[in-house]
Design a protein with these regions (language model features):
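Short coil/turn linking the two alpha-helices of tandem helical-hairpin repeats
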Residues: 82-89, 138, 157-160
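Conserved, well-structured interaction surfaces
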Residues: 11-84, 114, 132-135
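Hydrophobic-face positions in mid-chain alpha helices that act as interaction patches
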Residues: 165-235
Length: 235
């Protein structure tokens, strides 16, 4: 996301400048903590899935929705991990090349890296579960449409064109989203575009909140900020 147009402006951080310029290294904080942060999120998702019996008065519908939301998070995190720390899908004919460790239990002994085929199989299983058991609209939380959006992208990378098209058309034909009227998301002459401005009618699933203030990322022509790490400045 740091290298795409999902950004706003401005303020300062050499950390994000390094990402924008593709000059990251082991000591770049933003990338250095990603591996651990994704597994923290996966761990918490697994804890939720394994802890329902500890909650009194939890009805079946709520339990199913929470499990689906948790498995959505687990799938998305595993997907970003395998994209960043493994050769891409299709690098070997059967995708037997090493991916990343799979974590589907809250407490598990250290395990070797699963193959890319195994990681993608788990991702698809979790997203299909989320798609089947989440509502099409779910407020700020994961939804069935969000699961279809990720499935469309993942099937595209797998070169399963028909499956990718089916998931994309499901989202498009839902009537819940529409293309943004203005492709210029950065107001000319504006000093700041807040993260909230980047959630628009075409957003299927987005995260804009965070504890950080807006951060500058430089290119030769403009100053921008990553939306996922911006919060409105105090008045």
């Amino acid at each position: 996301e740091l290298l795409t147009d999902n950004m706003a402006r401005p303020y300062s951080s050499l950390d994000y400048t390094a990402v924008w310029n593709r000059e990251t290294n082991f000591f770049t904080p933003t990338t250095g903590g990603l591996y651990t942060d994704f597994y923290y999120a996966i761990y918490r998702a697994n804890v939720v899935v394994e802890s329902f019996d500890l909650v009194e008065g939890l009805d079946d519908a709520t339990r199913l929705r929470l499990e689906a939301e948790s498995r959505f998070v687990r799938a998305v995190c595993h997907w970003y991990l395998v994209k960043m720390w493994a050769y891409p899908y299709g690098y070997t004919a059967d995708n037997s090349h090493l991916g990343v460790p799979l974590r589907t239990d809250a407490v598990a002994p250290p395990s070797p890296r699963a193959t890319v085929a195994e990681v993608y199989a788990q991702i698809l299983e979790d997203l299909e579960f989320a798609k089947a058991n989440l509502p099409n609209e779910n407020g700020p939380y994961a939804s069935s449409m969000a699961a279809s959006g990720f499935l469309a992208h993942i099937h595209f990378l797998r070169q399963d064109w028909s499956a990718s098209r089916a998931e994309a058309e499901r989202v498009i034909n839902s009537g819940l989203f529409q293309l943004d009227d203005d492709l210029d998301r950065y107001e000319a002459g504006s000093d700041s575009v807040l993260a909230g401005d980047l959630i628009n009618p075409e957003t299927v699933f987005g995260i804009t909140g965070g504890h950080q203030t807006p951060i500058r990322v430089f290119d030769p022509d403009k100053i921008v900020v990553v939306a996922d790490h911006t919060v409105p400045a105090p008045s």
